[in-house]
């Protein structure tokens, strides 16, 4: 009888449980839905890279096959059939994930549409329709969109006109974050680790959690949102280590890959609340605006070398994985 008791005690005092008690919703960043249940996350996020990786696992072959079969029956041209099958793959994985998590799943719009507002809206509506057909209400789905000018405007339309919740990804700058809040999007995913990667490569020096540029960027955004009363949730993403994570404990949401979830699960190191909305209201900068001024948004974003390069790089990488998924489906079609 002692073994179950010991296990229960470990889970109760794990760093993962402490993070949850600090007020942060823990989100699993993975398409491998069988692997995430162990950590009992509130939500789950996916992206083209994660879906591509999961699609190659033999245990999930049946979902790919089902999506390919769907594609064969929907579409006039081969291209349309493949595109429909790819959307169905996203929804197949999302639907399975929602059987594991009690909250929401984030499903990403094709990154190749990052500079096309109209096409992004159309794709998002199609994904939501596929979820509806699968019995999943739109309230449980976050549509992930790259935080380009066009992406933010697409999310604005989806939220206001269609009541579709959006998760703005590839967000590397304060400028992007301000525009997203003004667009009344449901949630943003500011990146931590990729920002640190850029400055580490540029300067050649290591950073502590206190000096980490990615951590400081997310703190600034969080404080700005709370100070000015924006309802948009902040979900820190792209972590490189536990120190970055600990420095942001208390933030609204945190999306974590399986390796970091496992480290938190196995660790009993203390995690204390570092962020809270009340203290954040005392910090931050004065209110600024970008949402209705495209030239100003583009200029300020362009002045930020890191954000410009990382946004571009992120879109290229996600697009490459979409192309790889396209070829995988094409071969099966």
Curated annotation (Swiss-Prot):
Major enzyme class: transferase
SUPFAM superfamilies to which the protein is assigned, alphabetical: Aldolase (SSF51569)
Catalytic reaction(s) noted: D-sedoheptulose 7-phosphate + D-glyceraldehyde 3-phosphate = D-erythrose 4-phosphate + beta-D-fructose 6-phosphate
GO biological process assignments: carbohydrate metabolic process; cellular response to oxidative stress; pentose-phosphate shunt, non-oxidative branch
Listed InterPro entries: Aldolase_TIM (IPR013785), TAL/FSA (IPR001585), Transaldolase_1 (IPR004730), Transaldolase_AS (IPR018225)
EC code: 2.2.1.2
Annotated Pfam families: TAL_FSA (PF00923)
Active site: 144
Pathway listed: Carbohydrate degradation; pentose phosphate pathway; D-glyceraldehyde 3-phosphate and beta-D-fructose 6-phosphate from D-ribose 5-phosphate and D-xylulose 5-phosphate (non-oxidative stage): step 2/3
Gene Ontology CC: cytoplasm; nucleus
Assigned keywords, A-Z: Pentose shunt, Schiff base, Transferase
Gene Ontology molecular-function annotations: transaldolase activity
Function comment: Transaldolase is important for the balance of metabolites in the pentose-phosphate pathway.
Comment field (misc): Present with 1920 molecules/cell in log phase SD medium.
Family classification: Belongs to the transaldolase family. Type 1 subfamily.
Assembly mode: Homodimer.
Name under which the protein is recorded: Transaldolase NQM1
Organism: Saccharomyces cerevisiae (strain ATCC 204508 / S288c)
């Amino acid at each position: 009888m002692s073994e179950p008791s010991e296990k229960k005690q470990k889970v109760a005092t794990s760093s993962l449980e402490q993070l949850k008690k600090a007020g942060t919703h823990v989100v699993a960043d993975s398409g491998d839905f069988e692997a995430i249940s162990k950590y009992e996350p509130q939500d789950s996020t996916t992206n083209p890279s994660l879906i591509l990786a999961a699609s190659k696992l033999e245990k999930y072959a049946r979902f790919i096959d089902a999506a390919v079969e769907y594609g064969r029956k929907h579409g006039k041209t081969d291209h349309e059939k493949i595109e429909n099958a790819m959307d169905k793959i996203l929804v197949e994985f999302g639907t399975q994930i929602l059987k594991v998590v009690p909250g929401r799943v984030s499903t990403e719009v094709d990154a190749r549409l990052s500079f096309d507002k109209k096409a992004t809206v159309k794709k998002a509506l199609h994904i939501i329709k596929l979820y509806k057909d699968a019995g999943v209400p739109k309230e449980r789905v976050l549509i992930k969109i790259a935080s380009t000018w066009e992406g933010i405007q697409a999310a604005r339309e989806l939220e206001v006109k269609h009541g579709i919740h959006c998760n703005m990804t590839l967000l590397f700058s304060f400028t992007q974050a301000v525009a997203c809040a003004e667009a009344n999007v449901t949630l943003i995913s500011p990146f931590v680790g990729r920002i640190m990667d850029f400055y580490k490569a540029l300067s050649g020096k290591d950073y502590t959690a206190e000096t980490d540029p990615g951590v400081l960027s997310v703190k600034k955004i969080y404080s700005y949102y709370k100070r000015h009363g924006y309802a948009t949730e902040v979900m820190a993403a792209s972590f490189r280590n536990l120190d970055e994570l600990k420095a942001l404990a208390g933030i609204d949401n945190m999306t974590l890959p399986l390796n970091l979830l496992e480290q938190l699960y196995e660790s009993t190191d203390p995690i204390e609340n570092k962020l809270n909305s009340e203290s954040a209201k005392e910090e931050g900068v004065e209110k600024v605006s970008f949402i209705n001024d495209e030239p100003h948004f583009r200029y300020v974003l362009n002045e930020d070398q890191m954000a410009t390069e990382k946004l571009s790089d992120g879109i290229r990488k996600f697009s490459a994985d979409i192309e790889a998924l396209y070829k995988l489906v094409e071969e099966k079609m």
